[in-house]
């Protein structure tokens, strides 16, 4: 998951040279949604054939409640439509390393919101870590990327996407105690893909698809299957088993992979300020982890409704 998401920044950045960001992502999301819906249907058929003897990753027998349906709807809008809208729009307007480093503050955001919701008790080290991470982000988008310059708008859009992803991760945590990660991820993806495609429709029609190279088509398909389908599913399998706070820690390595790939492939410069900012973001996340003390145990596999 870490390697896929880290490399995906450069993949989509390169693809944007041939396909505008929103049409690219609309097609990517539609493809991922179709794959998810087909897989969910196959899992349901398999469950009936085996009388429900399947891994809770793919199927759980609990019926959807009215609250579940409402949650799936708004999580689809926030976690897929809005998140992808801001994330892709931001990456298109900033550097790969800037975007990845800002996303790297997600664990701190998730821990902070968890504390505000009463799910975690936050110690002084967490707040120190949050301050250190914010300082690192400032170095990246403030000094490292010429604050007020060409990348500022993109940096701010990526920051908004962090808010959307934090909301999505924490908001879906209770759903995957009753329903499989496959179902929750797939249904929210399908729900979010619809308004995204409608919003991007004028650009989709205006795009010269005949001029798109085979490389970019391959990148689009692989990004849909790996960065959206596989990685999203892995993310929520982890959330189901170890909880959102611990799962978010694995995203700490995404900026490192993204910066390395961008430096090698896209030849983005690794400035001292950017490297310092990266170090501060990671150090802040580490301090945040040390300062967290869970007030309630996070659900393990035996608590996940399987």
Positions of predicted regions on the chain:
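Hydrophobic/small/kink-forming positions within alpha-helical transmembrane segments
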Residues: 3-6, 37, 76-81, 85, ...
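Specific transmembrane alpha-helical segments of multi-pass solute transporters/efflux pumps
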Residues: 3-4, 8-9, 41-49, 54-103, ...
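Intrinsic disorder in cytosolic terminal tails and internal cytosolic loops
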Residues: 48-61, 292-306
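Glycine-/small-residue-enriched transmembrane alpha-helix faces in small-molecule transporters
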Residues: 1-26, 32, 147-174, 182, ...
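C-terminal transmembrane-helix exit sites in multi-pass transporters
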Residues: 35-41, 63, 106-131, 256-276
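Hydrophobic transmembrane alpha-helices of multi-pass small-molecule transport proteins
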Residues: 36, 122-143, 190, 196, ...
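Helix-helix packing/entry segments at the starts of transmembrane helices
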Residues: 25-27, 84, 98-105, 171-194, ...
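Juxtamembrane helix-entry segments on the extracytoplasmic side of multipass membrane proteins
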Residues: 18-26, 64-69, 127, 142-167, ...
């Amino acid at each position: 998951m870490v390697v896929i998401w880290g490399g995906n920044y450069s993949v989509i950045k390169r693809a944007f040279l041939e396909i505008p960001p929103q049409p690219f992502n609309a097609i990517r999301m539609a493809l991922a949604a179709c794959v998810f819906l087909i897989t969910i249907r196959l899992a349901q058929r398999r469950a009936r054939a085996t009388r429900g003897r399947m891994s809770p990753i793919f199927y759980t027998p609990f019926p959807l409640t009215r609250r579940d349906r409402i949650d799936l709807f708004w999580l689809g809008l926030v976690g897929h439509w809005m998140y992808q809208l801001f994330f892709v729009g931001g990456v298109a307007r900033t550097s790969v390393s800037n975007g990845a480093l800002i996303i790297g503050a997600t664990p701190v955001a998730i821990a902070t919101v968890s504390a505000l919701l009463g799910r975690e008790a936050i110690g002084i080290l967490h707040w120190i870590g949050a301050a250190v991470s914010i300082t690192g982000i400032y170095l990246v988008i403030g000094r490292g990327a010429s604050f007020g310059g060409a990348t500022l708008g993109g940096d701010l859009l990526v920051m908004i996407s962090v808010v959307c992803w934090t909301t999505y991760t924490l908001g879906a945590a209770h759903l995957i105690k009753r329903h499989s990660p496959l179902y929750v991820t797939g249904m929210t993806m399908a729900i979010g893909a619809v308004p995204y495609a409608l919003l991007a429709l004028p650009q989709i029609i205006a795009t010269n698809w005949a001029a798109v190279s085979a490389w970019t088509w391959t990148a689009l398909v692989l990004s849909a299957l790996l960065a959206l389908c596989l990685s999203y599913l892995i993310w929520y399998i982890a959330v189901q088993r170890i909880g959102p706070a611990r799962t978010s820690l694995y995203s700490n390595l995404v900026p490192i992979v993204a910066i390395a790939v961008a430096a090698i492939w896209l030849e983005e410069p690794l400035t001292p300020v950017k490297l310092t900012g990266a170090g501060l973001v990671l150090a802040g996340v580490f301090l945040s982890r040390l300062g967290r003390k869970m007030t309630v145990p996070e659900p393990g596999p035996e608590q996940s409704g399987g």
